UniProtKB/Swiss-Prot annotation:
Gene: rpl-5
Statement: the UniProt record of this protein carries the keyword Ribosomal protein: yes
Disulfide bond entries: none
Ranges of Basic residues composition bias in the record: 256-267
Protein name, per record: Large ribosomal subunit protein uL18
Compartments where found: Cytoplasm; Nucleus
Molecular function terms, GO-annotated: 5S rRNA binding; structural constituent of ribosome
Gene Ontology BP terms: ribosomal large subunit assembly; translation
CDD domains for this protein: Ribosomal_L18_L5e
Subunit structure comment from the entry: Component of the large ribosomal subunit (LSU).
Family membership noted in the UniProt record: Belongs to the universal ribosomal protein uL18 family.
């Protein structure tokens, strides 16, 4: 079939239908969303849970949600800016922090639904691919990965979050082919390399290299790490302590009491207050008039 030229006449514009708003804005892939949210027709009132992962410039966002007609319902969430509670104050957007955020989300949600003791996940970090197996009367919590419009690049931080969730005890259907350490040519997976990546060994190695080559640049580039007491010798151990702290207590921090905001506009008076203000002004004017007389 040859190329058909689109004739933009009155009939074309009369029948033209715009795409959905979030598609026009380039925010939602509805082809993927339909397949991630629509449940099997033989399942009734059974939500299809999604593991939503978003990487921003300053944060790693991980959520568990399901869709309704009114909109998505978020049942659990974890953010990398929560990691300072567990001993990690800097480097909150790197690969190791992404894994820790996923682990935090999994342990937090399983605690909420009472499955944290049944499904403890992969407690010893080896880097090996781990899939949750059913134990006891209750099946493991299942969620499918939702990456939005991000690219599925091998070794991406998105898959670090997924690895953390899977190791935390949630069933996320996946394969090892997108993890760091998987060789596309030989089709082999290097679990040891992935483990080192999760524990930030690549950062520690670069810190050692940079300190030897250019100490001024080292102090400048890793100034926040050094201020937090982190160096190449204790970085890996710090991430291990963070994982242990998350498994010990993954509950969210208590919300601080909201402070009353400062008012920059005049408070609106009630009817009785306005009436009283008029009466006071009249009384003052009468008093001034009497004094003049």
């Amino acid at each position: 079939m040859g190329l058909v030229k689109v004739i933009k006449n009155k009939a074309y514009f009369k029948r033209y239908q715009v795409k959905l708003r979030r598609r026009r804005e380039g925010k939602t892939d509805y082809y993927a969303r339909k397949r991630l949210t629509v449940q099997d027709k033989n399942k009734y009132n059974t939500p299809k849970y999604r593991l939503i992962v978003r990487i921003t410039n300053k944060d790693v966002v991980a959520q568990l949600a399901y869709s309704k007609i009114e909109g998505d319902v978020v049942v659990a969430s974890a953010y990398s800016h929560e990691l300072p509670r567990y001993g990690l104050k800097v480097g909150l957007t790197n690969y190791a922090a992404a894994y820790a955020t996923g682990l935090l989300l999994a342990r937090r949600h399983l605690k909420t639904i009472g499955l944290d003791s049944t499904y403890k996940g992969h407690e010893e970090l080896t880097g090996e691919d781990y899939n949750v197996e059913e134990e006891g009367d209750r099946a493991p919590f299942k969620a499918v990965l939702d990456i939005g419009l991000a690219r599925t690049t091998t070794g991406s931080k998105i898959f670090a979050v997924m690895k953390g969730v899977a190791d935390g005890g949630i069933n996320v259907p996946h394969s090892e082919s997108r993890f760091f350490g998987f060789d596309q040519e030989s089709k082999e997976y290097n679990a040891e390399a992935h483990r080192d990546r999760i524990l930030g060994k690549h950062v520690a190695d670069y810190m050692t290299y940079l300190k030897e080559e250019d100490e001024d640049r080292y102090k400048r580039q890793f100034s926040k790490f050094l201020a937090a007491g982190l160096n190449a010798d204790n970085l890996v151990a710090t991430y291990q302590k963070v994982h242990s702290a998350i498994r010990a207590d993954a509950s969210p921090a208590a919300k601080k009491a909201a402070k009353p905001s400062k008012r920059h506009t005049a408070k609106r008076l009630t009817y009785d207050e306005r009436k009283q203000r008029v009466a006071d002004k009249k009384a003052l004017l009468l008093q001034l008039k009497e004094q003049q007389e």
